[in-house]
């Protein structure tokens, strides 16, 4: 589908219902399509005699309000021949404040943020003539919720389809397989952390001795050994959850899974730093798991704790700086100017995050995405799923930084 065909399909589907989920790959123009839909709806015969129209735009973060205002101005605004247009922008965390009036059209930007139970309850109190939900990836359960409760229709165009239809450029994908060190005991494995008493230091070969003695111990181990222990712990919590359906077990399972991905990202910081050194004269974005990782590999770090994040983002787009590292904050509503290389230091099992980041990487006419990953780990599983459907001719396996 072309952008015009996507828009026409949106028009046809919203004629059947009052709720539309627009699930389009990052970079395909969700914002413009939604604004065109708003103008189409409010200029239809149902609103021809209105003197005032209320439009609600819900966003994930406060900074996104500025992005939306810039997009509204860029595409000519929201207009009606006679009615006064009132546009209200609120963050999802302030949804409850929006139940005070009737909105003719509500845009739910990055609609997956409304998926928690508390926000879905708040959603019930909103009075909206039309709902337009936007996201690159809408979770299956949320789609079902809107379908069953609002009779929502969905228009979809994923990254692969957008590339095939030349809406987005086809990236060159560089897979850089790595092996966890299984020789040098450079890591520390903490055992029985909740036990009182002095901390004992030992080696991995004495793991079971310390586990049985219930001593708080720090054991020297290799990268591979530590990753194996993460795998075992995660599998144990997962099995306990499956047996008991205990919410604390589920939370522990997911928490440890996140810590495992964080650890694997930590292990490759040296490799990522070397890649960035090789690309010193290029324009790059590096996706990291934590603030510490971002600050380790780059000088210009965009994250929630950096008061100068917006300034750095603008400096990058103005080409005053060529390298930025990001922690989550650039997953959504960020238009990166002429960014040729994207480096993935960490991976996410979220069905939303990986497609967003890959889409964010396709803003250059000839984008290159570099995936350093550890073989035989959860990273390899996530990566395999993330790139399925991409043109195999555009995927290349490299074994050294010099091949970049």
Range-by-range predicted roles:
Residues 58-102:
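Inter-Walker segment of RecA-like/P-loop motor cores
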Residues 113-172:
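Post-DEXD/H (motif II) to motif III coupling segment of the RecA-like Helicase ATP-binding lobe
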Residues 103-107, 323-327, 332-348, 353-355, ...:
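A short beta-strand element within the Helicase C-terminal
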Residues 1-23:
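Conserved pre-motif I regulatory segment
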Residues 360-389:
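Conserved segment of the helicase C-terminal RecA-like domain
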Residues 26-40, 49-72, 118, 291-292:
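Conserved Walker A/P-loop ATP-binding site and its immediately adjacent core
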Residues 66, 283-287, 292-334:
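Conserved helicase ATPase core of P-loop NTP-dependent helicases/translocases
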Residues 18-21, 159-283, 288-289:
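Interdomain linker/hinge connecting the two RecA-like lobes of the SF2 helicase core
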């Amino acid at each position: 589908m072309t952008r015009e065909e996507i828009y026409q399909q949106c028009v046809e589907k919203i004629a059947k219902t009052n709720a539309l989920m627009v699930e389009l790959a990052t970079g395909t123009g969700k914002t413009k399509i939604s604004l065109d839909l708003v103008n189409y709806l409010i200029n239809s015969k149902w609103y021809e005699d209105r003197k005032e129209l209320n439009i609600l735009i819900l966003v994930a973060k406060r900074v996104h309000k500025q992005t939306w205002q810039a997009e509204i101005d860029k595409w000519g605004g929201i207009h009606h021949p006679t009615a006064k247009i009132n546009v209200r922008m609120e963050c999802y965390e302030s949804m409850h404040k929006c139940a005070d009036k009737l909105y003719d059209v509500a845009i739910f930007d990055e609609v997956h943020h409304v998926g928690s139970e508390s926000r879905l309850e708040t959603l019930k109190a909103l009075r909206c003539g039309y709902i337009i939900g936007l996201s690159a990836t809408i979770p299956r359960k949320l789609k079902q919720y809107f379908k069953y409760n609002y009779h929502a229709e969905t228009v979809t165009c994923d990254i692969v389809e957008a590339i095939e239809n030349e809406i987005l450029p086809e990236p060159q994908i560089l897979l850089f397989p790595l092996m966890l060190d299984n020789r040098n005991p450079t890591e520390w494995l903490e055992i029985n952390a909740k036990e009182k008493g002095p901390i004992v230091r030992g080696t991995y070969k004495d793991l079971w001795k310390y586990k049985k003695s219930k001593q708080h111990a720090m054991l020297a181990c290799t990268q591979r050994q530590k990753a194996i222990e993460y795998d075992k712990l995660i599998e144990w919590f997962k099995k306990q959850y499956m047996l008991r359906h205990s919410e604390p077990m589920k939370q522990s399972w997911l928490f440890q899974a996140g810590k495992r991905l964080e650890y694997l990202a930590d292990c490759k910081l040296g490799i990522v730093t070397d890649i960035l050194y090789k690309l010193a004269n290029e324009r790059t974005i590096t996706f990291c798991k934590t603030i510490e990782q971002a600050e380790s590999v780059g000088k210009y770090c965009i994250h929630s704790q950096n008061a100068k994040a917006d300034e750095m983002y603008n400096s990058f787009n103005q080409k005053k700086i060529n390298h930025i590292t990001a922690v989550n904050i650039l997953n959504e509503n960020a238009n990166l100017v002429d960014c040729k290389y994207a480096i993935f230091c960490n991976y996410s099992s979220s069905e939303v995050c990986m497609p967003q980041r890959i889409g964010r990487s396709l803003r250059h006419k000839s984008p290159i995405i570099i995936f350093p990953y550890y073989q035989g780990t959860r990273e390899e599983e996530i990566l395999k799923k993330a790139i399925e459907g991409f043109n195999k001719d555009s995927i290349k396996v490299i074994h050294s930084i010099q091949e970049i």
